[in-house]
Amino acid sequence: MLKLLWLACLPAAYVNTVFTQTVAYASTEFGITEQGQGFAAAIVRWGVIIAIPLASYADKVGRRRVIIGLAWIAPLIISLGALSPSFTFLVATQTIGRPLGIALTVFVLVFATEEMGTNTRAWALSILAVGSGVGAGSAVGAIPLAGISDSSWRLVYLIGIAWLAVAYVLTRSLPETKRFLALHEEQTHHTDVETHIHRDRLWLQIAVAVLTNVFVATASIFQSRYLKDVRGYSALEISMFITLTTIPATVGLVVGGRLADKVGRKAVAIATVPTGTLLFASSFALQGFAMWLIAIVGGVLLGISYPAMAVFRSELFPTAHRNMASILIMVASLIGGSVGLIVAGYLLDNGMSYGRVMLTFALGPVIVAALVAAKYPETAHRELEDINPEDAHLQGS
């Protein structure tokens, strides 16, 4: 089961990554400023609202059907970027395609949370994150194609069609989650079965997601531009930097998953979120060996923090609303982060240094660590039905 979900993460991550890695090159062809790039990235993120009805549909008809549909549609739409006659057309295709990839990622994580055991949920998400890293890495690895000519960035979008092979495998082999089948059976025989989204948990996670994504979105969008314009890196050098600083973070993901399942989500998150963020932000103010080293260490710590923070999003909500809650958190995260992108683009265009912008935005994840310490429940070693008592009736189904 985990192997199939891992495969599903490949196209999802590619679709999610390709625009952030190529926007600097597309902007060169179309003459777009850094502020314009930030605004475009914000628009693409706002498109995530189209995932809300998909989440509602997945909670009603099942995870499998929606995951398979998105695995087919998302790569096809994203590949239309290769045909862009203008920057506006490119942004339009990604405003539709990228949110579908994001929705695919969210639904896969929900699927894994429902299927994995009490002491392996965070670890499973860490393994899926490695798959996402491979998918995203394939987009990063294709960056040298963007350096061939002013318009060769289009090739990076075109090769995304190859991910349709994964959709074929999922169509043939992916089952439905046992928890959803139990819920569906219960609802069929007892029409009065009702659950609700815990609003306090939802608003808390929305706040945490927004504060985190203000930094993450800005760092991911402007890293290539920083390396290209400030450090004078070529397309190949940018690809090497991102790849070589990301690989160690993959080890951090697996370690973080094990730690989150063994010692608890809260301890891992509190220790690694602020330190990893501040270190990674500092890499935008450094150069040479120091820039590489700090980016690697910061990336490893953020990798360790990811499974603990990610698993909360689906653990804290009942089966009937797990996809919807997860998508609402993601929507708020991306829309909130888009505001950060616009602000960052404005600040950079008006002379503020990359290092100062990133360190300012790093305050968000520092606040997140405090919120996790004060407000989050510990979910390690607990069944989902224990965390969400309204699902207790499903255990006997």
Q: Language-model segments: what does each one mean?
A:
Residues I50-P85, A260-K266:
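Conserved MFS/SLC helix-loop-helix module at the cytosolic interface between two early adjacent transmembrane helices
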Residues T93-V130:
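Cytoplasmic helix-loop-helix junction between adjacent transmembrane helices
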Residues V15, I96-V108, G298-M309:
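Core transmembrane helices of Major Facilitator Superfamily
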Residues F19-T20, D200-L253:
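Extracytoplasmic gate region of multi-pass secondary transporters
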Residues T120-G147, W163, I327-L341:
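Glycine-rich segments within core transmembrane alpha-helices of 12-TM secondary carriers
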Residues G31, G62, L83-T88, G232, ...:
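Helix-breaking motifs and short loop linkers at transmembrane-helix boundaries and internal kinks
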Residues M1-E34, A219-S224, G340:
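Extracytoplasmic
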Residues A41-S56, T243-V255:
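Central cavity-lining transmembrane alpha-helices of secondary-active solute carriers
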